[in-house]
Curated annotation (Swiss-Prot):
Function: Required for the cellularization of the syncytial blastoderm embryo. Involved in the localization of the actin filaments just prior to and during plasma membrane invagination. Sry-alpha together with nullo and bnk may provide auxiliary functions, by acting both to stabilize a large and dynamic microfilament structure and regulate its functions.
GO cellular component annotations of the record: adherens junction; catenin complex; cytoplasm
Organism of derivation: Drosophila pseudoobscura pseudoobscura
UniProt name for this protein: Serendipity locus protein alpha
GO molecular function, one term: beta-catenin binding
Amino acid sequence: MESLLRQLSICNELIAQGPACPVGNIAWLNEFCATFLDFASELKAHLPEIAPRWGAPEGGNNIEVETIFLCLTQVVTCITQLERTINIESKFGHETTPMTRLHFLDRIDWCVRRIYVSLSQLDLHQESGAADNLEDHTFVELMDLALDHLEAFMEGLGNTTSNFLYIEEENDTNDACQLGSIINHIVRHALAFANVALEADKKALSELCETLLSECTTFLEGSAELNPGHRKLEALSLERALYGLETFLNEALLHSIFASLVELENTPINRLRHALQEQESESGLTEKLVSDFDTNMDRIQQIGVLAIAFSQDVKTKTIVRSCLASLESLDACIVPALQSSALHHADILEHHFNDEMLIFRNLIHDIIDSRSLVNNYLDMLAESLHIHIAGKSVPREYLLIVQMGSVLAEHFRLPVNYSALSDDGKRVHKDLILILRECLAAVSLATPVDPKRIVKRLKILYSVLAKLRDVIDKNVHDSVFNLSSRRQITNATRTLLRSCKSKSKRQRSYVKQSQDSVVPDPHNYTSSIANSISNDGDLISFQLTEILRIN
């Protein structure tokens, strides 16, 4: 441990030299990379000793280890951007990018210091054997904890001979927390998402949280005089409230994913940049664009938090966290940068934003189950057609629903999703792309089109998507419909994850299920560095990315 901390101290000293280095001088960054590479290699070799509980069934979710993985990934990301910055400096001069250099140096410095703190905490945890905190658990982990409590309680009802009924606490650390506290944390996660969810979903999420709290209170305050049958009904009601909240939250999550990705297409960062530079003539529009951008960034953060919760792969979790960290860091400075006259500073931050967003989008598409995404869009499309029949639709709603269909096209553009389709599925997918193009052309024309013609195409789109859903359904494993136990029947309704190696006993159908979850290469996360190898700094960045692969 002392050797690791000493190397981190050297890294801090090298980073401190960064702001004062001459124009185009990459030697100091190379030296930092070499030192950091030594640190990462040693950390990888000694991780089992430093964090013996990491990866173990009884304590694999160590927040300090996850923080270290995040910081390692962020350092590599920032090094890549620093290389671009230094190359621009060597071409145009130091005065072009001082803010950019400081931005990435500050992020690296923070990450290195945070790794130092996390390693120190791990050392303390080894000595004290500190237990996990509920604050460190994800929404999915909390759901499993609550359901495990209820499952143990109902099993105990069949064995008890006493009138005094209670929840038996397990020796396991995760089960040592009281059910009421677990439910409160679940509600906290749900309300955090509800704050950024679409308006149509906010009220329902709030009501489901109230129902869950009410059922929890009824269950926890249940009288000892009640018979086991009555207590079991209370437990089942609480379990039903938990599943109801999770199911609706995931439907709302998919709604938010459609809305956020469409918003990114409608308001790309370069359009925001243009609007900010022309703000004198369109100040009202500019304010709205900035407000919408901020709202969408908040929504993307919550989407990412839930994506991390549903993903069971360490690499995927780490890269999603890194994307969120980059986007959060950029959120505070990108609008001022786009408004400033520092063109190179704005160019680099815009490029960085687009890179991180592309990685994030592809990871989200890799995590989400194709069938759930199709079903969710079919529901929205059916509602849109119903609104038209009621005579309440407007042209913008047609455009929006078709743009959401383009999110499906983007989903299947990812090789891992397209390759999962059968031959019939690929034929139907081809039809989907054709009808989507027709629909988009119809709703995008400057000349108004008869709504009946648009609706006719939307109905064809619905029919094609229904066929695609049916084809995907045929590929679903029979295990989803296994009727061997009550728990499996209940879980079949849990609608985002590929079948993956999960610590959870409950499989979520809204997430892809895969044999061995492997982080996709959405933007060729490593090859994008390898392809630009033109100097020592590029080479070391590539080596760092390779060494930081997590087994």
